[in-house]
Amino acid sequence: MKIAVPAFMIASLASLRFTGDVAAMPEGTVCFPNEPLLQVSAPLREAQLVESRLLNLLHFQTLIASKAARCVQAAAGKPVIDFGLRRTHGAEAALLSARASYLAGFTGTATVPGNVRFGIPLFGTMAHSFVQAHDDELEAFETFARTQTDNTLLIDTYDTEAAAGKIVALAHRLKAAGVEIRGVRIDSGNLGEHARLVRAILDAGGLGQTQIFASGNVDEYRLAALRAEGAPIDGYGVGTHVGTSADAPYLDCVYKLHEYAGRARRKRSEHKATWPGRKQVYRYADASQHMLYDVLTLDIQDGTALLEPVITAGRHVQRPVSLDHSRDYCRQQIESLPAVLRALDDSPSYPVTVSPTLRALTSDVDTSTS
């Protein structure tokens, strides 16, 4: 299907400026189904023009941050690094995935533009190809260790435990030159079993301070399993499963009209109905600041209002905050969740109630529209 757009309509975009209002939940806020994350109040063409891009940004980063937060919970305090660049769906997705996962608690990223653009700490290790480019594995280890002071050596290209033995011999020789081997990385096989064997080899060789870093198709469930079995792993690289949000590749994130020409509107499609009017979400917590329930309403209530003004009459009214500030806020938000909602397994739904006034408006809208 082809759509012909008159030239005057295209020309009018040159002078188009956003003149409306935007309210949003602060980045890093824990949110639940049927809650508006962002609200745009503007002339229709201004509001429609930004629809697809807003959905694209909100949907993707909410998806990745949610998956990353689960990995952080499963790692239980051990560092988790974003290794997702090669598996994400495009370069921008990799950059935004690095940002969203850092916001949700990852320690850093291996995606260099994430540091350049957002100041995310950079981490990396050697590649299998680096080892294979040398005729001797030990030579590869020594070259990398001497040139990279913050080194972590990849030891599973050939034989993981044999490589750990080489690391022990190399470490003592390099120590005389003032070079320390900081860590080793295991990227394949039974990570827990390999980690136990490697830890024993390193400890017996006097390398108790050398850390073990694990990667390779890791997600929150594997992290939890490795923790449960007591695997001696000091940190993790997580790529594919977070960068693609493998087991939950989309959210039903939508952008719908709720008021036009001074009248409340709503969609009534089967399984896709929306609530009308300019709504607010209020959050209620107990004395320990753990979340109890949210209310979706048209009224002013005494809870904490989650939608805050960001743009008024086309101008920013909220000062920008740093990514690290949002990261700290996100951590506080996750800590305020009831313990049962921080578990990886199925848990009770968090209560989000709809106020009587909103239900009454919904009934009025249904009565007055056909």
Region annotations inferred by a language model:
Residues 25:
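Active-site cofactor/substrate anionic-group-binding motifs, chiefly glycine-
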Residues 123, 184, 212, 234-236:
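Hydrophobic residues within beta-strands of alpha/beta enzymes
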Residues 21, 151, 210-212:
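Short active-site oxyanion
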Residues 13-19, 28-205, 220-222:
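Buried, small/hydrophobic-residue-enriched core segments of structured protein domains
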Residues 1-21:
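Translation machinery proteins
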Residues 203-205, 210, 218-370:
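Gly/Ser/Thr/Ala-enriched C-terminal appendages of enzymes
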Residues 1, 66-70, 84, 342-349:
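Short coil/turn segments at secondary-structure boundaries
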